Structure formats: structure tokens, C-alpha cells
């Protein structure tokens, strides 16, 4: 597992299996997962700042060509489930 902080309030967590979880502030909002069929972003809207964070992650870091066509929009619950799968709670 690797933690990469891009800037204040933008963090990427990468796992050994290739899964990526991108956080804006403390919320996982985008990433990459084979189980979610590639790159994904939340369908939920949080703020214009979070939207900019997601777009920068997909366009600059992940370098996804044509993100509008190549990124799946998923329910926030799917991202939350992915987090709990990758980081099981001990409680």
C-alpha cells in the first residue's frame, strides 16, 4: 500500500493489486479498480472544488484519455464498499 498526497486535501491510496482510491478532503470520490471495470468517479456531487480535484486526478495523474467516455460513474456506495473491501474495519 502506498499513500501519495498531491496537495492539501487531495490524496491517492494505491494498493498492491493495482486498486487506487482518490480522496478529496476525507471522502473517496474516484479511483481505479478491476472490480469496478477500470477508472471510476462518484455520481454524487460534493462541491465545485471536489469536482476539480476529481478532474485533475483523472486528467493529470491517471492520464485517462477522453475521461468522459472512459470513466465509469458509480454510486458513492460502490466506492464506500470498495474502501471497506480494501481496508477492512477491525471493529
Task: Set out the residue ranges of the language-model regions.
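Terminal leader/tail segments of proteins
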Residues: 1-91
Amino acid at each position: 500500500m502506498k499513500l501519495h498526497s498531491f496537495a492539501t486535501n487531495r490524496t491517492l491510496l494505491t494498493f498492491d493489486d493495482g486498486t487506487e482510491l482518490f480522496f478529496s478532503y476525507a471522502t473517496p470520490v474516484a479511483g481505479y479498480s478491476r472490480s469496478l471495470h477500470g477508472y471510476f468517479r462518484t455520481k454524487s456531487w460534493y462541491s465545485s472544488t471536489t469536482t476539480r480535484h476529481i478532474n485533475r486526478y483523472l486528467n493529470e495523474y491517471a492520464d485517462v484519455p477522453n475521461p468522459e467516455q472512459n470513466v465509469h460513474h458509480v454510486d458513492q456506495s460502490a466506492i464506500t464498499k470498495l474502501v471497506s473491501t480494501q481496508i477492512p474495519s477491525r471493529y
